[in-house]
Curated annotation (Swiss-Prot):
Assigned keywords, A-Z: Hydrolase, Metal-binding, Metalloprotease, Protease, Zinc
GO MF annotations in UniProt: metalloendopeptidase activity; zinc ion binding
Active site annotation, chain numbering: 44
Lineage, opening ranks: Viruses, Varidnaviria, Bamfordvirae, Nucleocytoviricota, Pokkesviricetes
Enzyme Commission number(s): 3.4.24.-
Protein name: Probable metalloendopeptidase G1-type
Broad class of enzyme this protein falls into: hydrolase
InterPro entries on file: Metalloenz_LuxS/M16, Peptidase_M44
UniProt keyword annotation of Ribonucleoprotein present: no
Organism (species): Yaba-like disease virus
Function statement: Seems to be involved in viral proteins maturation by cleavage at Ala-Gly-|-Xaa motifs.
Family: Belongs to the peptidase M44 family.
Binding-site residues, Zn(2+): 41, 45
Cofactor note: Binds 1 zinc ion.
Length: 590
């Protein structure tokens, strides 16, 4: 690790897929509390800008931090180009960017509203911890920010000037003289301390039960913020599923999720306890770069390589014993937060400023101090990398898709089905997918199904009526029978579903993945969409799908860009109506 004179920390991570990865601590949406919620997320969208034909890049805003990364595309750009591109997001002519075009701000606010819509159609993305801290359940920014553009612009300026050197963490794939000089002349010029300070007023959030949509019964237990506990949690994350951590303000929580309600109840009632007796004696942790960046930003006193702490702390069973006792003591004192699966839209006792509804209760269970646990919690151990292949006509398809999305597993779409890479045993996956809570959770967001239902409409010979009879699966893709797609006179189908989206097939003699990606970014810059999924159907034909609150505008843009198209425009309604979706099936007799 290299520390610049102003406190910027630089790590060499030759194993990551990114060229450069930058994080800014104390810069997430937790800092929006008391201001306009969504400023942090808006700033992230404004800052990142790149040529998608030369680079792959992304950014994200979390509760405590913001992160950005960039990677060159081989043959289109090089490593130093990536470094310069990421630097350009923050600096212009060696000066910190703090003046933003109002028209760009407007478009990005529209994009944020599309992201909110997308996330609420596909996920349950409510952050209860920030809500308990006096924020909202959703803190990513809404379209009503357009009503306060002058204030928003001032807050963006002030937020940029709160970036300081000690809060910057940079991972680079390699560190040569040129790369180091570029970083020193940009992020190395940031001040060591901010010009102004703000201290968010956090509420006491312990001893609460939150009832909300969730696939698991989750308990977040407050533990001491010590180097020993942090390294212990990292070792546990490397070893087991359903164990992670959260940081709220200056507090550290271990999160433990249960598939069965009885296991959860035994734990919070002191009948069972955690025993970490089977954690391997790690000398190196193979944590992904996202997890490492999260750790360095949440725990700024981690000033060395994570793996160095394994020997410095001299992690042992005694280290885990201390964490076990810390957890058990917090359970006894109700220093924890519970997320209890709850799917009713009509039962609630709290709402945030955006009128999102939720149930929050006080923990009332009592554990006697002399009560000794009789059982050990069964933990799901991580396996070596496994792969599942699910055919499109499998009735379990949607469950597996939601499972994969929830765990951020890679989903690879093929002609006949999807491949999902994971680290679960077959028994553990079965127990999760067959649990009542996961079944309710997977059915609580039906919008994810539309993408696959309508894909099958275009590539199979089946009618929409046949396809709708098989909602739990999709009709098997019939590409192996060499179906040929002909573009007829009708290029638009208007339907009514539970969601706003545009999908369909587009054709162009020069179409490829790059053209599709560029199209997505053009639509994003206009504030018309947040994300676009695509599947290659033939050499010159792609299927695309995107949620949007501006379906007519998206259709107009796509119909002008791709002359050969057949698109479905869905608008929200109480009763689904697919009656306009008629197609001709031509059978060629040989």
């Amino acid at each position: 690790m290299i520390v610049l004179s102003n406190g910027v920390r630089i790590f060499i991570n030759s194993n990551m897929n990114k060229d450069i990865y930058l994080g800014i601590a104390s810069f997430g949406f937790e800092n929006d509390i008391g201001e306009i919620l969504g400023i942090a997320h808006l700033l992230e969208h404004i800052l990142i800008s790149f040529d998608s034909s030369k680079f792959v890049a992304n950014a994200s805003t979390a509760r405590k931090y913001m992160s950005f990364w960039c990677c060159s595309i081989k043959g289109k750009s090089n490593y130093i180009d990536s470094i310069n591109t990421l630097i350009s997001w923050f600096f212009n002519n060696n000066k910190l960017r703090d003046n933003f075009c109002l028209n760009d701000i407007k478009n990005h606010i529209k994009e944020l509203e599309n992201e909110y819509y997308f996330r609420n159609e596909v996920f349950h993305c409510m952050d209860v911890l920030t809500f308990l801290e006096n924020g909202d359940l959703y803190n990513g920014g809404r379209i009503d920010m357009l009503n306060n553009l002058e204030s928003v612009n001032n807050m963006l300026y002030n937020r940029m000037h709160k970036i300081i050197g000690p809060n910057i963490v940079i991972f680079v794939k390699e560190l040569n003289k040129n790369c180091l000089m570029l970083i020193q002349n940009s992020f190395g010029t940031l001040p060591s301390c901010p010009m102004s300070f703000s201290f968010p007023n956090f509420s006491n959030i312990d001893g609460k039960i939150i009832m909300m949509p969730s696939p698991f019964y989750t308990v977040m237990i407050k533990v001491s913020l010590s180097i020993s506990n942090v390294i212990s949690i990292m070792c546990l994350f490397e070893t087991y599923h359903l164990i992670d951590y959260e940081t709220v303000g200056n507090d550290l929580y271990v999160t433990l999720s249960f598939v069965k309600e009885s296991d959860y109840e035994n734990f919070i009632n002191g009948v069972s306890t955690l025993k970490f007796n089977n954690v391997p004696n790690y000398t190196v942790l193979s944590l992904c770069d996202d997890f490492l960046m999260n750790a360095y930003l949440c725990f700024p006193w981690l000033s060395n390589d994570i793996n160095n702490y394994l020997s410095t702390v001299r992690y042992s069973q005694n280290m885990f014993k201390n964490l076990e006792e810390d957890i058990q003591n917090s359970i006894l004192l109700k220093k924890y937060i519970v997320v209890y699966p709850h799917f009713s839209k009509t039962v609630f006792n709290k709402n945030d400023s955006q009128m999102h509804k939720i149930v929050i209760l006080d923990c009332l269970n009592e554990i006697k101090e002399d009560q000794l646990p009789k059982l050990n919690v069964n933990l799901m151990k991580k396996q070596t990398k496994n792969e599942i292949f699910i055919k499109y006509n499998d009735s379990s398809l949607i469950k597996y898709i939601i499972f994969a999305i929830g765990y951020k597993n890679n989903i690879l779409r093929g002609n006949e089905g999807v491949s999902i890479h994971h680290q679960f045993s077959s028994e553990d996956i079965k127990s999760i997918l067959e649990s009542d809570t996961f079944l309710k959770y997977s059915k609580s967001k039906p919008a994810a199904m539309y993408q696959y239902l309508l894909l099958s409409f275009f590539v199979s010979g089946y009618s929409i009526e046949d396809i709708l009879l098989n909602r739990e699966s999709t009709i098997k893709l019939l590409k192996q029978y060499n179906n040929k797609i002909l573009f007829g006179k009708k290029s638009r189908y208007d339907i009514t579903t539970k969601s706003n989206f545009v999908c369909g097939i587009i054709k162009n003699k020069n179409i490829n993945n790059n053209v599709i990606t560029n199209t997505m970014w053009e639509l994003k810059k206009k504030g018309l969409i947040y994300s676009m999924e695509h599947t290659k159907i033939d050499k010159r034909i792609f299927y695309i799908f995107m949620f949007t609150i501006y379906p007519d505008e998206v259709f107009l843009y796509l119909s002008k860009k791709f002359l050969s198209h057949c698109l479905i425009v869905s608008k929200t309604g109480n009763i689904e109506d697919f009656s306009s979706m008629k197609k001709d099936v031509i059978i060629k007799l040989c």
